[in-house]
């Protein structure tokens, strides 16, 4: 039976109906093609075990997909089937499940070393446990680490642990791999005294050096800056680069009908960007959470011009066999994780979904922010009904949906893995309004995507994102705190409001510097998972829905 399953899976990998291919106009007069197969993953986020189709914890009654054992099966098979294959990892291997909370860098390095990549860049989440949490990983990982835009002059422990690029040889040709990380990593993680340099200029400089000094034939950028920024990078990094293997934005790219999973298609696979010189640069990305492995073959002419390409992401559905060695290696870790993770916290009679969190209020966002407010209502002994009536949550901190049924400790950690504290502070209405404006100002060439959206409790917001930045809040109403009967009143820029939120946001994460720089009477609270556990038990069975707290005109 196993042999039959493997045979069917191999057929799925090579059937042309699932492969997108296209010619690229070529000025190369050579007749011989050089194929370069690139197998790639990104944003693994500690999904060692199989998940449900949305990347959350898989329950016995659900359809399970992905997981590291299937990922290894697929990567090995694609490497064997490809031509001059390279395997690239576009970062954010850290953070996302109880596996990481308990095993940290140790478990990540252990399993990544069972399937070393030819190159790996670093992502923002690799710095979530500060410099001390990444240096040990860099010291033991068997994969070359490439990042071109880090200045480590003030972090001596980081020196010598990575390079700007690496040169691989395949079929007699030299392939340069240049790494790049998001320039705002210091705003969204904890990288100590590292400085992050301009992404485009850093890639341009290193790619030029590779072409001129190392005499490489092909340059691939291994990027963890997000699809929007990859568009800009492809346009502006010069004709030194040929393709970008991306991550960070969890973008599912697909060409054609009938994508295999439940992911929303963001753009084509690959995206084609035409530079002003006429050169085409390709961009690929493979969603997130070990549900897909990217697979593309680039065909170059004798003069190293891109002629054509073929490929598509491979979906790791339940038909993909798991590598027995990996399954066996995981058992000891699973026992350790499951002992804590299988504890039942509460019951939910609704799906707690993050799907719409960037474009409206979502019920999981309502659950988070209501939990934050509830934390302080229950311990309050003073006048009025609460010491804090407004709860805020950055959507990037909500990491997974949860299906209806029992909620375990492991699922809750997967929802909120970052171990923030739930803190309170005073903020003027003026700066609160600035925060609401910042939540909808991130540009996106595919249309508004709410990258920095805030989920809220005790707030009613109407946005018009067709208006100019800084003028998009049409209406903002705040639930009163110092009142006998809670009601919503227009936000007053001169009023002072008591706010509760995660420490990440309170300290200016995601660019919310107006909160960091203007908060008063700051008090640190309990860990977020303790707050969420307490509220889940209080609310069980959970029935929260979408309540129209946020409305967006676009």
Swiss-Prot record:
Q: Name the reaction it catalyses.
A: a ribonucleoside 5'-triphosphate + 2 H2O = a ribonucleoside 5'-phosphate + 2 phosphate + 2 H(+)
Residues spanning the signal sequence: 1-21
Q: Mind listing the UniProt keywords for this protein, alphabetically?
A: Allergen, ATP-binding, Hemostasis impairing toxin, Hydrolase, Metal-binding, Nucleotide-binding, Platelet aggregation inhibiting toxin, Secreted, Signal, Toxin
Q: What is its EC number?
A: 3.6.1.5
The UniProt record gives the binding positions of a divalent metal cation 2 as: 92, 124, 224, 248
The listed locations are: Secreted
User: InterPro entries this protein is in?
Assistant: 5'-Nucleotdase_C (IPR008334), 5'-Nucleotdase_C_sf (IPR036907), 5'-Nucleotdase_CS (IPR006146), 5_nucleotidase/apyrase (IPR006179), Calcineurin-like_PHP_ApaH (IPR004843), Metallo-depent_PP-like (IPR029052)
Primary location recorded for the protein, binned into one broad class: secreted
Q: Does the keyword Manganese apply?
A: no
Going by the entry's taxonomy, the superkingdom of the source organism is recorded as Eukaryota
Q: Record-annotated residues binding a divalent metal cation 1?
A: 43, 45, 92
The record's Pfam families line, in alphabetical order, gives: 5_nucleotid_C, Metallophos
Write out the residues that bind AMP: 358, 394, 399, 418, 504, 510
Q: Where is this site: Transition state stabilizer?
A: 125, 128
- Biological process terms in GO annotation: AMP catabolic process
Q: In which tissues is it expressed?
A: Salivary gland (at protein level).
Annotated GO MF terms: 5'-nucleotidase activity; apyrase activity; ATP binding; metal ion binding; toxin activity
Give the matching CDD domains: MPP_CD73_N
Q: Which cofactor does it need?
A: a divalent metal cation
Root EC class: hydrolase
Q: Which GO terms describe its cellular component?
A: extracellular region; plasma membrane
Q: Which family does it belong to?
A: Belongs to the 5'-nucleotidase family.
Q: What does this protein do?
A: Facilitates hematophagy by inhibiting ADP-dependent platelet aggregation in the host. Cleaves adenosine triphosphate (ATP) and adenosine diphosphate (ADP) to adenosine monophosphate (AMP) and inorganic phosphate. Shows potential for antithrombotic activity. Can induce basophil activation. May reduce probing time by facilitating the speed of locating blood.
Q: What is this protein called?
A: Apyrase
Q: Lineage of the source organism?
A: Eukaryota, Metazoa, Ecdysozoa, Arthropoda, Hexapoda
């Amino acid at each position: 039976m196993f042999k039959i399953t493997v045979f069917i899976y191999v057929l799925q990998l090579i059937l042309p109906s699932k492969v997108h291919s296209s010619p690229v106009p070529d000025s190369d007069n050579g007749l011989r093609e050089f194929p370069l197969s690139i197998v790639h993953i990104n944003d693994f986020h500690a999904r060692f075990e199989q998940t449900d189709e949305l990347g959350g914890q898989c329950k016995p009654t659900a359809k399970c997909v992905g997981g590291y054992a299937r990922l290894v099966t697929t990567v090995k098979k694609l490497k064997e089937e490809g031509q001059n294959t390279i395997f690239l990892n576009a970062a954010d291997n850290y953070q996302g499940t109880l596996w990481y909370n308990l095993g940290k860098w140790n478990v990540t390095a252990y399993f990544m070393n069972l399937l070393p990549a030819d190159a790996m860049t670093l992502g923002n989440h690799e710095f979530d446990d500060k410099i001390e949490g990444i240096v040990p990983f860099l010291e033991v990982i068997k994969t070359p680490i490439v990042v071109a835009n880090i200045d480590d002059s003030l972090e001596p422990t980081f020196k010598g642990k990575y390079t700007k690029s690496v040169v691989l040889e395949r079929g007699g040709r030299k392939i340069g791999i240049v790494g790049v990380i998001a320039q705002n990593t210091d705003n969204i993680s904890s990288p100590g005294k590292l400085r992050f340099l301009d992404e485009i200029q850093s890639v341009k400089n290193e790619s030029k050096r590779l072409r001129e000094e190392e005499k490489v034939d092909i340059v691939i950028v291994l990027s963890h800056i997000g699809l929007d920024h990859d568009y800009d990078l492809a346009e502006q990094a010069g004709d030194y680069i040929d393709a970008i293997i991306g991550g960070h934005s969890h973008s599912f790219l697909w060409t054609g009908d009938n994508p295999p999973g439940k992911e929303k298609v963001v753009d084509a696979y690959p995206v084609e960007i035409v530079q002003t010189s006429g050169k085409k640069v390709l961009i690929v990305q493979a969603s997130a959470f070990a549900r897909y492995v990217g697979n593309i073959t680039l065909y170059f002419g004798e003069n190293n011009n891109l002629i054509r390409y073929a490929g598509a992401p491979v979906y790791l559905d339940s038909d993909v066999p798991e590598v027995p060695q990996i399954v066996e290696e995981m058992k000891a870790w699973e026992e350790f994780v499951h002992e804590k993770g299988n504890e039942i916290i509460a019951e939910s009679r609704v799906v707690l979904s993050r799907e719409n969190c960037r474009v409206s209020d979502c019920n999981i966002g309502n659950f988070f922010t209501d939990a934050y407010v509830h934390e302080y209502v229950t311990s309050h002994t003073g006048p009025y009904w609460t010491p804090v009536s407004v709860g805020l949550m950055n959507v990037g901190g909500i990491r997974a949906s949860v299906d209806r049924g029992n909620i375990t400790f492991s699922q809750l950690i997967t929802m909120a893995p970052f171990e923030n504290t739930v803190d309170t502070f005073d903020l003027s209405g003026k700066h609160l309004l600035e925060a609401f404006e910042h939540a909808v100002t991130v540009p996106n060439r595919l249309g508004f995507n709410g990258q920095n959206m805030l989920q809220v409790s005790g707030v009613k917001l109407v946005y018009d994102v067709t208006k100019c930045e800084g003028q998009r809040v049409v209406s903002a109403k705040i639930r009163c705190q110092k009142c006998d009967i809670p009601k919503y009143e227009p936000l007053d820029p001169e009023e002072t409001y008591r706010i509760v939120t995660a420490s990440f946001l309170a300290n200016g994460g995601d660019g919310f510097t107006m909160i960091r720089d203007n908060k008063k009477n700051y008090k640190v609270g309990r860990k977020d998972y303790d707050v969420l556990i307490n509220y889940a038990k209080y609310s069980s069975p959970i029935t929260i829905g979408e309540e129209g707290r946020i409305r967006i005109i676009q």
